[in-house]
Structure formats: structure tokens, C-alpha cells
Amino acid sequence: MLCVATHRPLKPPPSQKMKTWKFAAKFVWKNNFVKDKAELGSWTRDQLLELGPTFVKLGQIASTRADLYPPEFTKQLESLQDNVPPVAYDVVQDVVNLEYFVEFEPIPFKSASIGQVHRAKLKNGKDVIVKVKRPNIYETMKVDTDNVREIVRFLEKVGVDTGNSSEFVLNESIEYLLGESDYQQEIENAVRFRKNMKDVKWVKVPKVYKDFCTDDTIVMEYVESEKLTELTDPNVNRKKICEALINSYVIQTMDKGFFHADPHPGNLGFSSKGKLVFYDFGLIVDLSEELRDGFKQLFGCIIDKDTKGIVQILVNLGVITVSYTHLTLPTIYSV
């Protein structure tokens, strides 16, 4: 008698959408019941890395939001800022025109969610960095962000508090996130930002070599620095650095109306020449005249300690909303 072996068909690997829903469900549960927030942060970091570049970027943003998450949690996410698994060098070779360079380091010294950075030397002897975009990153992020939209809508519908994830805020965040994959826009942002800050003596913005850039690569001046969170020189005045950073943002927002909106520690440095260095110009916000005027008024009210003025300006700008049914402005002012 002939026996025929039968095998169960292999299950297809779970889709990205299924993985995303599974992560969201587990995170909501763990966030409510896991008391050790460092443990939660470590688990979240590993899950985001597995889910891919879109979620790594969301983790980078979360790592800087000490106003929303406990420090034990955000500390675990900090490695996402510049320590993401890189794509293979053979993929890089297919993207980069190596004929431009006399030297090109195959191992990236920095790998982020949307691209990775290699050191190189141009034929004119200039030391540069080459930022290489991950393959198909826009399409990947588009699918992922559509899944995130669907999950947030579901969670809000069933009564789960999603924080600042209203439809408007979510859509705006996704728009900026997808915009970061546009290297031509980032090149223009970097050129304009450098021009805006050229007279600010304590700020350094690397030069872009546009002739060597493409839709998938950005070639910039190499500027060495230390991360602001890893300064080792005991003689460095950290208070002065903080003041310089604040002053640079006053210039960016109120004077130029064009500011760096992704200032996590992986995108900021302090050079040996005592300058604050800005990197990565994928997320830059161009303020309208109305918003610039609003910021100027807001800073004036903060200096004058005018609480009523601060609240009124924030309401006028749409930063906060007030329900007059439950809470009136005089009630807020009296707090």
C-alpha cells in the first residue's frame, strides 16, 4: 500500500498591518499595567526596531518627549536616535555614484530611520558625509502611517485615551513624517537654514555640495562634534550651550520664521570650536507671518509674566482650545 505523506501548508508570515495592530494592543495593555517603565521602554524600543523605519522615527520623537513620558521610558528609546540597523553596502553601491569620491567608508558611522550616513572624501580633498536614503522608504512609510491612522481612530472610538492624537494633529504629524523622505526638499531646507544662520557666530550649519546630490543621496561638509547628551569636557559650560540653543531658536522662529523641528540629541552637536552644530534638515517648519507675530507676542507675555496674555495668544493660535461650557477663560486665569 502506497502511503503519501501530507504536510500542512506553511502559514504566511504576518503582514505589517497585523504586526502593527498586535504592537498597538500590547502597548496599550502594558502601558496600563507594567509598573517598571524602563522595562516598558526597552520592550517598546525592540518592537519599534522590528516594525521598521516609520516606527523607529516615531520612537525617536517619543524619546524627546519628557513632557509626555517618564524619563525611565524615554531613556530606553534614546538609542533609536542614531543607532538603527543599516542597509547592506551592496544596496548603497547601487545608489551612490562612487566616482565622485576618492574615499568612501562602506560602514556607516550613523544609521537612522530614513537614511544612513557614510564618511567620504571628494576628489578636491574635502571631507564630507554622504546621506543615503533607504530603498522604497516613502512607500513603506505611507503604508505604515495609514495603519497608524486606522489604529488611532479605532482606539478613540472605543474610548482609549490617545493623548495628542486628534485627527488634525495626527494628519499634520504624518505629513511632516512623509516629507522627511524627500531629499530634494531637505537639500533646499539645508541651504536656506545655513543662509539664515550664517551670521550667528555660535552656530555651525554644514555646507551642502549640491552638485553631488541626487534624489537618494545628500553630500554635505563633514563637521565633527559631540552629542549634547555625551559631552565629556569638564570645562564646557553646559548652561551657556543651553542658552545658545534657546537663542538660536528665538532667531529661527521670530526672526527667520524657519526653524529646525527635529532637535533630538542625534541631530545636535557641540564642536571643538565651541559652536552649536545642527544636522539633518528633513523636518523644517516654515512659519506664516501670523504665527511669527503670535510667537513674538507670546515671548513678550512670558517675559512680562502675563498669564492672561499667554493663554489668550495660545487660544488665538489654536494651540489650545477652551470649552466655555465647562471652563471659562476667567477660570483659567485664576489658576
Residue positions per predicted region:
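Catalytic-loop Lys-Pro-X-Asn motif of eukaryotic-like protein kinases
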Residues: P265-N267
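Conserved catalytic-loop position in the HRD/HxD motif
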Residues: D262
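Broad phosphate/nucleotide-binding scaffolds in NTP-utilizing and phosphate-metabolizing enzymes
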Residues: M1-V250, G257, G269-E289, D293-L327, ...
